[in-house]
């Protein structure tokens, strides 16, 4: 069949950016004023964002917050909020009358440990089926308005039940529809807007439903929504909804609300339980328990948490775990004597005896002095500053660069260490003793152009074997390789296990490895993966039997580039010439 001539344009855009794991991400376990528990999914990139979600970090000795210093220093953080014993959510219960509580009637939140029991708020009845739910707070002691309590009111307008959440001062904090429904009549079937009920549960910033009365088939709130959709909506089944034991009307039915509690100071077991929450996130490079030595009064409890964290990091090989040597020789409540060299060494030795050495664990000591928000010079913990240095270095230069020293380790707003300053050249022997005990120190040193500055000196892991992984930069390089290559390799799982696929893998990872050479992460590399093979007889790393069982092996060899540790300069005064020329003026 003949066709009229024409020009056809087809467009294909191959400029698709390859996604790579985010750099400069760390994770703190911390006590905060508010915020989600068990959900570090939101990446915190600014201090204002942290304040909006978590309020502020609770620092027992009143010093500068680790989280604040990390975020100001350039970190991107995942925050795991640690709760204490007795933590529970707040509840709402039926008020005696539809009125706002007077000031002297405000009910304080209960601090009784255990699972919170919700009171019935809304009851659904259809035929012989009766189910109900109550409401609890989403947070554990999180502020709702300005008071210790709040109120919730429900009213009905036409066919819709609405809710209002009232501050203790009577102002409305949140409002909206709960559910719209109309039971069957002579002309119409029962109609239920079950999606509105689902939206109420998911969209409220303060409250979440908790089932009170259930049946064999309706045991969760999701089951309730599904039951309304499949068994009630657009059926002949009648539906009655009661609020507070009676049908909702235009007159508001009021409930009293309490905030719940975040519990007492967490024990070692609560800190350890929270460690599991980081396992879902492999973009994290640095992990630490913020101010833990201020919460736990005995070294035994502190070391128990560090041991659990070290074991997890050694098993997963996904994170580096940072341990702060407490800045004082005792718990801050018992005294504020700064640690000296021998006290730092003794503490690290005790820690090593309890948890062992590991390339995934690093020790930071010395404390640091900052001016706080009131302009007072404060002895502060150092891990927030360390996170900021490590993450900024990773984001700007790559995680394979050391973040200690005068180029990437200067802390311009720091006012020196809490401990004696071991950064003076005349105290090198003492600083060297600390280095031999894996202590990464906050010191003051003279810089070429900025005078005396506070900085991090040393960037060692606690690897006992004297190989290149005693440098944190090499450990972080290996983590980078793992986090970057893993999604690429995962993409090829279930693909044909043959040399054509292996060649594609090599071509995809080669630019990444070449870039690492260009960026001085490694001086050279060799990728041995049979990518150039054309038959089973040409295999050198793999063998036919394994390949035909779906197994493929690659060996990546590289020569690492470690941070410069010693410079020797020989200054020689040249000898005078042995020949002497004497000239006489004539």
Where are these regions (language model features)?
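Structured, hydrophobic secondary-structure cores that serve as assembly/anchoring elements
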Residues: 1-100, 105, 111-114, 273-586
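Small/polar, repeat-rich beta-turn/loop motifs that tile beta-strand-dominated architectures
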Residues: 1-33, 52-266, 270-276, 553-555, ...
């Amino acid at each position: 069949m003949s066709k009229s001539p024409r020009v056809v344009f087809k467009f294909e855009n191959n400029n698709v950016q390859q996604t790579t794991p985010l750099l400069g991400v760390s994770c703190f376990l911390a006590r905060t004023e508010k915020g989600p528990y068990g959900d570090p999914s939101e990446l915190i990139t600014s201090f204002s964002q942290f304040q909006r979600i978590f309020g502020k970090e609770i620092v027992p000795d009143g010093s500068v917050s680790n989280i604040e210093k990390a975020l100001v220093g350039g970190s991107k953080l995942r925050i795991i909020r640690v709760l204490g014993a007795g933590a529970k959510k707040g509840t709402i219960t039926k008020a005696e009358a539809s009125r706002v509580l007077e000031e002297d009637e405000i009910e304080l939140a209960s601090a009784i440990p255990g699972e919170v029991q919700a009171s019935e708020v809304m009851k659904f009845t259809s035929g012989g089926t009766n189910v109900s739910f109550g409401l609890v707070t989403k947070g554990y002691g999180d502020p709702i308005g300005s008071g210790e309590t709040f109120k919730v009111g429900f009213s009905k307008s036409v066919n819709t039940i609405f809710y209002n959440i009232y501050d203790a001062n009577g102002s409305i904090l949140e409002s909206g529809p709960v559910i719209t429904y109309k039971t069957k009549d002579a002309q119409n079937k029962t109609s239920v807007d079950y999606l509105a009920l689902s939206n109420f549960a998911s969209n409220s910033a303060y409250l979440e439903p908790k089932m009170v009365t259930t049946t064999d088939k309706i045991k969760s709130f999701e089951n309730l929504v599904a039951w309304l959709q499949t068994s009630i909506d657009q059926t002949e089944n009648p539906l009655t909804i009661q609020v507070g034991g009676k049908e909702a009307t235009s007159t508001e039915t009021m409930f009293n609300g309490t905030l719940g509690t975040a519990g007492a100071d967490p024990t070692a077991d609560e800190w350890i339980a929270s460690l599991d929450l980081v396992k879902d996130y492999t973009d994290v490079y640095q992990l630490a328990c913020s101010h833990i030595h201020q919460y736990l009064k005995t070294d035994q409890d502190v070391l128990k948490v560090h041991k659990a964290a070290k074991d997890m990091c050694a098993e997963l090989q996904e994170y580096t775990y940072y341990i702060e040597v407490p800045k004082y020789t005792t718990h801050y409540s018992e005294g504020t004597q700064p640690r000296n060299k021998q006290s730092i060494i003794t503490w690290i030795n005790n820690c090593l005896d309890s948890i062992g050495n590991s390339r995934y664990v690093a020790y930071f000591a010395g404390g640091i002095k900052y001016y706080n928000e009131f302009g007072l010079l404060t002895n502060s913990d150092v891990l927030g500053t360390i996170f900021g240095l490590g993450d900024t270095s990773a984001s700007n230069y790559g995680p394979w660069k050391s973040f200690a020293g005068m180029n990437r380790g200067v802390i311009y707003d720091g006012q020196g260490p809490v401990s004696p300053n071991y950064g003076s050249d005349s105290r090198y022997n003492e600083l060297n003793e600390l280095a031999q005990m894996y202590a990464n120190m906050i010191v003051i040193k003279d810089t070429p152009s900025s005078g005396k500055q506070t900085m991090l000196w040393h960037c060692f892991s606690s690897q006992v074997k004297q190989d290149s992984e005693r440098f944190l930069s090499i450990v972080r390089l290996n983590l980078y390789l793992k986090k970057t290559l893993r999604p690429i390799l995962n993409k090829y799982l279930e693909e044909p296990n043959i040399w054509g696929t292996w060649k594609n893998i090599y071509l995809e990872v080669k630019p990444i490895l070449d870039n690492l050479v260009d960026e001085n992460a490694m001086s050279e590399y060799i990728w041995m993966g049979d990518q150039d093979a054309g038959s089973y007889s040409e295999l050198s790393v793999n063998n036919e039997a394994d390949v035909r069982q779906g197994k493929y092996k690659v060996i990546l060899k590289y020569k690492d580039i470690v941070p410069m540790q010693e410079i020797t300069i020989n200054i020689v005064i040249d000898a005078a010439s042995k020949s002497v020329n004497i000239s006489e003026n004539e």
